[in-house]
Amino acid sequence: MTQVPSEKKICKNGYFSENHKISLRSFIEKYDKLFVVYRRNNIQTAYSYLLGLMKCEKNHTNMERMVEQVPEQAYHQYHNFLSESKWDYQEVNERTALEASALIISCKANSGKPTGLIIDESSHLKKGKESVAVARQYAGVCGKVDNCQVAVYASLCNEENTTIIGTSLFVPQKWIDDKVRCDKADIPVSKQVFQTKPQMALSLIKSNIKLGVKFDWIGGDGLYGHNTELTKELDKEELFYVLDVHKDELIYLEEPSFSIPLKKGKRGASPTKVKADKTAFRIDKYFQNIEEDQWDRVQIRKTAKGWKYVLVHTVSVWHWDGEEETARVRTLIITKTQETNPKVKYSFSNGAISDYTTQEYAYFNVVAIGLKEVSMMLKTNLVFPGIKYVNGWHGNITNHWL
């Protein structure tokens, strides 16, 4: 085991206690062999880099600042560790994901609450054009188009616990169209193919299943719930999900049939568009007509102020993607907080309405969102110190997970 920085130097700024340092060092020692490249052990650099990330002030993290905080390592050592060294970040990620899965399973054994795999995207504002996959695109962190990197994340959650277990960097189309730029950033040729965020989410889900990560259901926001390519694939794989949908999503309260209407009269062209024999409703219009006695008040989680309650309504509906010959049956879950200006959430599930109780569907719909907010807080604390290469980006994220 390579000598790590002394505890006195690490703890002098008061960020960590002696006990925390001992536990952190013991934890990272488990990954010792994964940082060995051609007989060179990078564990000291990994340890120092992790400490540098934790010690530097948010939004002021770069390799120069990290060297100031942990002077045992030089700038070029950090740069080489992230961008040049051939340690396998994927192998480290897989180890942490499996350890997280085992921990969440033990939490489930105690609480009885199901484990969710939450898919969500997050943006990280950047300056300049050199960072890998940076572009002017929508940045959720500030609610507008800005210069940023965007990534899709997978998190495991169970009741009060959540942790990030996977990520994939979104590469904009303008980057894919510029092979020279992709090659310069060391993006593998196999990855120089444009993927939408829902496609990236599906890849994360499948890779974690293949790895052996255990979960009971899949959650995500409206970007994923609205994407029928993703939901049809989850149906095909028989993976249970509860995904948010937008308020303008169209639903049928009865199973519709679809056909091209017969031509009426002799004038004009014949109809070519398929139409349903039932009326479709926007979800928010349906919500406005729910009677008071059609809501269930359920207890969902304990807070510092006591138990949190929400109103829940579930109903079987049909949703059509505009392409298939038939509509697919979904359970629509609507939750409403008990406030002067209530917050309303809509979700679709491929589970039958009889498969789960109203309270269980409320858990999937509401509790998971609270944990997503915690996960979002974790992601906003990630720092990206001027990384130009794709392996460096993933290596940086990997050290955050440790």
Feature locations, PLM:
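Short, catalytically relevant binding-site loops at active-site mouths
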Residues: 225, 248-250, 353-355, 383-385
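Small-residue-rich helix-loop
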Residues: 398-402
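An anionic, glycine-rich sequence signature occurring as long contiguous blocks
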Residues: 160-183, 251-366, 370
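Short, well-ordered loop/turn and helix-capping segments at boundaries between secondary-structure elements
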Residues: 72, 353, 367, 371, ...
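Conserved, well-structured functional cores that handle cations and Mg-NTP chemistry
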Residues: 2-218, 225-250, 257-259, 264-281, ...
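Intrinsically disordered or highly flexible coil/loop and linker segments, enriched in small
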Residues: 59, 63, 214, 370-375, ...
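Short, solvent-exposed helix-loop connector elements
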Residues: 356-365, 380-397
